[in-house]
Amino acid sequence: MAGSGMKSLAKDTAIYGLSSILGRVLNWFLMPLHISIFTNTIEYGKVSRIYGLTALFLVLLTYGLETGFFRFMNKKEENADKVYSTSLITIGCTSLLFILFSICFITPISEWLRYTDHREHIMIMAIVVALDAFMTIPFAYLRQQKRPKRFAALKLAFIFFNIFFNLFFLVFCPWIKEAYPDFILNKFYHQDIGIGYIFLANLISTLAVLILLIPTTMKGLKIDFDKSLLGRLLKYSFPLLMLGLAGVISQTVAQLVYPYIFDSVEEADRQLGIYSACVKFSVIISMFIQAFRYAYEPFFFGKNKDGKDNTKSYADAMKYFIIFVLLIFLVVMFYIDIIQYIMHRIGRNYAIGLDVLPYAMMGEIFFGIYFNLSVWYKLTDKTKYGAYFSILGCVIQVVMNIVLVPIYGYIASAWATFACNLIIAAISYFIGQKYFPIKYDLKNIFLYFVLATVFYIAAMYPQIDNELLRMGYRTLFLIAFAAIVIKKDLPLSEIPIINRYFKRYK
């Protein structure tokens, strides 16, 4: 692994990744809990739809300001305290306005979203998304100040709160109601609220983290709003809103369009419930991308600040990123029998959708590549290209879903995500080489993709009835791929944590 910069990036990725991976894994366990309790796929489809809308509005309410915050905090000519204060005040005001707007227009909003039976679900999550948007700047401040442990602790606190209150409302309270009918708690618990308790648990957890976050990031904060600075921030950040929309649509396009392309909302929610539950298994790719992103943005902005040519570091980061995501892809697909067993045990009605998984994971991989490539227009302040790519991606996603989902079903959503991210990544690469040339190791990157594809086909194609023999056969290909990677580009003595053992036995 080349250079001290890569070791620093790997170390930060490991710290952020620990919280991201642990948090995502813990949060993932809510999916089995939910589908085992709400066996009707329509109910889980409603949950998925609301969270898809929440993700979309979170991007809209942060309007790219998180990345703009990093950019301006690293500019020598800008006052860091003023950047923080201006960003915080701006996003706080827009979040408050969003809550007030949602309260005043909840009826037409729920009708427009085709979610009229439980408007309170929308209202609860409107408050949640506004609070989440406000907290993006304090969390970004922790990253900027190189406080990954505090950042990780607060992120994990939310996960633990959320899991606790989900278990409290969905498991403990029903058990108390059945075992002890006269218990005082039963007066406040109403089982017919159903999935509403999922959203209520989220709201309580968000408020708890906000209370913990404020003393850490706002102690001694000077209120200093600079209108001129805000204009520069928005000019830089607003095009990144489109980039953010591309990312969120890549993950939530089904939740956004299904209610409008099926004959009934119930059928849309049924298909969405199956699709969403199975796509959750691609979380291992997305959480690695998230961990990498947390470390990579401060890394490349910080590198750019020192005025040196760091394109070699960016190229190395891309190659190692691709190596790891391909390894993750092969691990998940080679042991998909375990996933199938889990799904049949906890949610038989959902298991039929697992055929979406390879396409969903490849879609995530190419979105990660696209994020890596975005370094060229972020560092050259040509963020308008991010907007162009995002608009193109949105069009591809929406058109493919509208045209193909009614014919082929939910699997077409996974195809659309894969195709969209592949296309915009390719276009970004070719345009980026014109404005900010980076010599990526295309030869080895292409080789690893070919090897992964060949090994995947060779491992998955033979029909081996015995499960242990089947997984053992596939494991041989996984070992072979890992051995090639280690031999060519990833000596074990250079990997953080593992390298300690090599030093010990030298």
Predicted regions and their residues:
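Helix-loop junctions and terminal segments of transmembrane helices
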Residues: L61-E77, C278, S282-K319, S374-L379
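Transmembrane helical elements of multi-pass membrane transporters/channels
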Residues: D12-N27, I198-L213, T217, K227-F301, ...
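Interhelical loop/hinge segments that connect adjacent transmembrane helices in multipass membrane
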Residues: M1-G5, L9, I176-Y197, L210-Q251, ...
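Hydrophobic alpha-helical transmembrane segments
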Residues: M123, A153-M218, I391-I396, Y410-I431, ...
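Interfacial segments at transmembrane-helix termini and the short loops linking adjacent helices
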Residues: T41, T107-M125, D269, V332-I365
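Membrane-proximal transmembrane or re-entrant/amphipathic helices at the cytosolic face
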Residues: A2, Y461-K506
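Signature of the first transmembrane helix
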Residues: G5-E66, S95-F105, V128, I163, ...
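N-terminal membrane topogenesis motif
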Residues: M1-W28, E78-D81, S85, K227-L243, ...
